[in-house]
Amino acid sequence: MAQPSTTYKFELNLTDLDRSVYESVKQTIARHPSETEERMTVRLLAYALFYNEQLAFGRGLSDVDEPALWEKSLDDRVLHWIEVGQPDADRLTWCSRRTERTSLLAYGSLRVWEGKVVPVANNLKNVHIAAVPQEILETLAKDMPRVIKWDVMISE
């Protein structure tokens, strides 16, 4: 029998000085049985970094046609597609064609991946890539509690 997803409660107190966003948000998120704590942590970071009222978690690992997070318009167009991890160049190209803006938070051992994917991504005008430092990610993901409370301040 398949293992069920693990449910987490996430409370985010967000202060984004650059965009004048001051929000307190509560979410219930599911962690797929095959999803690592690091991947879930990067999804939460992406939620904080790109937050807006229309941003939603995708089905992620259980549906390859959906991103980790996305922002949709009221007429169901995808405005912002957010991936996490190390997708291949074909996946990034495919994602970029379905949205106005594509963002990727990459993590893990990036040296080989970077050499293969970044040259292709540089030719895609609507793709933006940021790397999450592994040491910080490991600290955040270690012993992830079922109730997560983050205070995040963003400033350039």
In which residue ranges do the predicted regions lie?
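Short Lys/Arg-rich amphipathic alpha-helical segments
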Residues: 92-96, 109
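Acidic-basic catalytic patches of nuclease active cores, encompassing PD-(D/E)XK
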Residues: 16-61
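Helix-rich interaction surfaces within compact, conserved domain-sized segments
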Residues: 2-32, 101-103, 109-156
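Conserved catalytic cores of phosphodiester-cleaving nucleases, focusing on short active-site segments
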Residues: 69-71, 76-91
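Short connector loops at helix/strand junctions that flank enzyme active sites
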Residues: 64-66, 77, 97-99
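Short, well-ordered alpha-helix to beta-strand connector turns
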Residues: 52, 99-100
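Long amphipathic N-terminal alpha/beta scaffold segment
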Residues: 55-74
